[in-house]
């Protein structure tokens, strides 16, 4: 897959949806968009936005598959990633359809531990964060900024009564609300 992309991608900026079907929809907004690669859950289009080369690559769901995509994209020259997709609101002010711009993440998953000690915080690039906030404002979207909670299980915290560790899940969920986490997701 990487060899397919290396011949065609030299873009610093990559938008990362989870669902491969979202790639074509995002690429419709590019000038000169074309399909570069399609293998398993990884689909890549490249093109231009406002004269800047940009790509979109799907990652599948969760940290392990996202890390595969990002590792290969870094080898192709990418250095700025914008993850787009679905999250669940933790903060009751976050409503369906709102934008959440993550400034950092609680690392409750396993993948990031392969890259940095758990004590090291997962924080977003300030310039990229500010650009996403400015774009949300310009487009009139309701947005929230703050820390998100990243996890490995899609259903665990959303259906805790079904889980053997329901007590722990419920208590942690309340803790994330109290400390101000905005949303829960699986790829940050």
Language model features with spans:
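Glycine-rich phosphate- or other oxyanion-binding loops that anchor nucleotides, phosphorylated ligands
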Residues: 37-188
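Single conserved hydrophobic/aromatic residue that forms the stacking wall/gate
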Residues: 1-9
């Amino acid at each position: 897959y990487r060899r397919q992309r290396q011949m065609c991608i030299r873009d610093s900026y990559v938008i990362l949806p989870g669902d491969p079907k979202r790639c074509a929809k995002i690429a419709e907004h590019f000038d000169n968009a074309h399909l570069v690669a399609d293998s398993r859950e990884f689909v890549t289009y490249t093109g231009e936005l406002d004269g800047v080369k940009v790509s979109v690559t799907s990652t599948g769901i969760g940290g392990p598959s996202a890390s595969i995509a990002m590792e290969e994209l870094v080898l192709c020259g990418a250095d700025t990633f914008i993850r787009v997709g679905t999250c669940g609101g933790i903060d009751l002010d976050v409503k369906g359809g709102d934008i959440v711009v993550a400034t950092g993440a609680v690392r409750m998953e396993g993948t990031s531990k392969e890259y940095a000690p758990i004590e090291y915080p997962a924080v977003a690039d300030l310039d990229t964060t500010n650009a996403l906030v400015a774009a949300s404002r310009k487009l009139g979207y309701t947005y929230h900024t703050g820390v998100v909670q990243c996890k490995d299980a899609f259903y665990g915290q959303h259906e805790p009564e079904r889980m053997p560790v329901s007590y722990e899940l419920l208590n942690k969920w309340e803790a994330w609300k109290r400390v101000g986490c905005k949303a829960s997701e699986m790829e940050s």
